[in-house]
């Protein structure tokens, strides 16, 4: 038989692990299928995507016609859950630094003309936007950083929902938002 072996990489493309399995796995979150390649990030706990999206949804208060920014958006977990709520007149722009993840996102949202996928550093891409109604961000453990937080505040969104795995990073972001 044929086996697929892939090497996992850090954000700077340093190889850190080798794994065996399909090149692309498909996960359904609330019935929306998401393709995730081996080089892209995905939550390891099987219930985490559903629990996270429900929590974010409860805080975001997204409305039809909203422009939503999904920062550090990966393969599009949050984007997938807000599509039906923004309607055809709304828009979601997903920004992610991983080329593998944005490649997956392009496949996941190929038929959705109101979703933009942007590959690159969030800090550099965020200033290109002139407004956003809602911003969702799920940055890496070190947090979003002062410049990203201040750029978000300048967009004057109705809501910012920050998913943080490190309380200290969230505290820094909150402090920077008040400056």
Q: What positions do the PLM features span?
A:
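Accessory RNA-recognition modules of RNA-modification enzymes
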Residues: 1-137, 142, 147-150, 156
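C-terminal substrate-binding/active-site "lid" region of AdoMet-derived donor-dependent transferases
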Residues: 150-154, 158-179
């Amino acid at each position: 038989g044929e086996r697929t072996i892939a090497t996992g990489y850090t954000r700077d493309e340093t190889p850190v692990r080798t794994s065996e399995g399909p090149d692309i796995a498909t996960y359904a979150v609330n019935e929306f299928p998401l393709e995730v390649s081996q080089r892209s990030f995905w939550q390891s706990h099987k219930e985490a995507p559903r629990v996270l999206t429900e929590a974010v949804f409860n805080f975001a208060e997204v409305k039809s016609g909203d422009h939503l920014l999904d920062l550090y958006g990966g393969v599009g977990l949050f984007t997938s859950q807000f599509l039906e709520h923004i309607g055809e007149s709304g828009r979601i722009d997903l920004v992610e630094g991983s080329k593998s993840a944005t490649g997956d996102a392009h496949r996941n949202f190929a038929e959705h003309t109101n979703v933009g996928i942007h590959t690159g550093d969030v800090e550099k891409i965020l200033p290109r936007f002139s407004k956003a109604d809602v911003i969702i961000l799920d940055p890496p453990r070190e947090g979003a950083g002062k410049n990203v937080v201040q750029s978000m505040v300048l967009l004057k969104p109705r809501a910012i929902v920050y998913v943080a795995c490190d309380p200290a990073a969230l505290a820094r972001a909150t402090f920077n938002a008040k400056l």
